[in-house]
């Protein structure tokens, strides 16, 4: 849908850049753009009262250190107490577990994150360097006039305009959808996750990865002490409904020795002082914006999941949020310098990233040969080979 005709208001505030979405990508971009530009962050939710759905995406590779330093975030990041990433053990290409040592990575092992603390720290840094945050905005009225994007929130009763508009709204891609940009969804992958309370005997810090007949698992102990367990399956899988219950999800996970040894046992779980935590479901499949159409819209950019959303098996979501914020900051500099086609290099980089990602994703999903005949695996192998 094209931008609506903008009604004139006398209380419209002028900015250089408006970022819709105060998640990792939007907040990182705000850090990078200040103090050169006047930056407004608009967030649909009220962050102080946001729904208590634990975020998924708990790791950063060592290569992220360069970006964190560039954004002025690294010292604060280290002080936040994220845990160094240790080994990964996987039952993937074969049922027998195989160990992978992160110390082989020349960029360093990376980190397991306290995701909530990481996001809060990014936003706090953006505000410290002078970005302005307005939260609880709800649906935004969107228009464009005289080369300016114009937005207004009915909840806040305030108008804003800027020559640059950023969609950092995550997988919803709310601003891109309003502008009629197509989004290609590769598959209907769903992530079911549960955050388990601390268990005294669980001191394991490894990332555990298991292929299953109709999907795949991962589990890791977070810096806060809780353990996340996640299962990824098709959205139309008949087992999906039953696995939304913690008892069923845990029972299925315990069928894998690699997971069973770090999960709580049955005795007393969900009884009295040990309540069963909820299971959360969220879309997790690959998706990409129409990058050619994106380049054709002056002053409009997409970052993070709003541009490209990665399958969690790639462990690239948070790194991509930071990397796309850096690339977009450079494009915005080119725009304000008056250069033609400021987005061209950024779009080309996104397209290259997505091409490499799909190639690696195909190789990853081709690993569990023992499951190739099952619909979950056969569907992905066929789609990624095309």
Segment roles from a protein language model:
Residues 26-27:
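N-terminal Rossmann-fold NAD(P) dinucleotide-binding loop
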Residues 103-124, 174, 239-244:
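Short beta-strand to alpha-helix junction loop
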Residues 31-56:
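Glycine-rich FAD pyrophosphate-binding loop
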């Amino acid at each position: 849908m094209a931008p609506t005709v903008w009604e004139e208001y006398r209380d419209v505030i002028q900015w250089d850049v408006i970022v819709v979405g105060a998640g990792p990508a939007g907040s990182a971009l705000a850090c990078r753009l200040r103090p050169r530009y006047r930056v407004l962050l608009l967030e649909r939710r009220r962050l102080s009262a946001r729904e208590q759905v634990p975020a998924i995406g708990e790791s950063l590779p060592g290569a992220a250190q360069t970006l964190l330093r560039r954004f002025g975030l690294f010292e604060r990041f280290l002080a936040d107490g994220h845990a160094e990433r240790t080994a990964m053990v996987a039952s993937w290409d074969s049922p027998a577990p195989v160990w992978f040592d992160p110390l082989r990575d020349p960029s360093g092992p990376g980190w397991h994150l306290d995701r909530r603390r990481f996001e809060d720290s990014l936003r706090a840094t953006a505000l410290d360097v002078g970005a302005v945050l307005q939260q609880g905005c709800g649906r935004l009225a969107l228009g464009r006039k005289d080369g300016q994007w114009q937005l207004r929130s009915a909840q806040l009763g305030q108008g804003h305009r800027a020559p640059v508009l950023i969609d950092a709204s995550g997988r919803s891609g709310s601003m891109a959808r309003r502008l009629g940009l197509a989004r290609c969804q590769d598959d209907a992958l769903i992530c079911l996750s549960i955050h388990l309370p601390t268990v005294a005997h669980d001191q394991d810090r490894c990332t555990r990865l298991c292929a299953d007949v109709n999907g795949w698992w991962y589990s890791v102990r977070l810096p806060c002490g809780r353990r996340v367990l996640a299962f990824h399956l098709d959205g139309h899988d008949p087992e999906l409904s039953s696995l939304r219950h913690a008892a069923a999800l845990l029972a299925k996970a315990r069928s894998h020795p690699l997971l069973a040894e770090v999960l709580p046992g049955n005795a007393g779980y969900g009884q009295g002082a040990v309540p069963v935590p909820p299971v959360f479901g969220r879309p997790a499949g690959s998706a990409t914006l129409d990058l050619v159409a994106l380049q054709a819209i002056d002053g409009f950019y997409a970052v993070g999941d709003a541009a490209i959303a990665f399958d969690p098996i790639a462990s690239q979501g948070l790194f991509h949020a930071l990397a796309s914020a850096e690339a977009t900051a450079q494009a915005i500099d080119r725009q304000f310098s008056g250069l033609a086609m400021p987005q061209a290099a950024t779009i080309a980089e996104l397209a290259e990233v997505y091409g490499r990602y799909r190639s690696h994703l195909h190789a990853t999903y081709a690993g569990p040969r023992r499951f190739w005949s099952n619909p979950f695996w056969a569907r992905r192998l066929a789609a990624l080979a095309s």
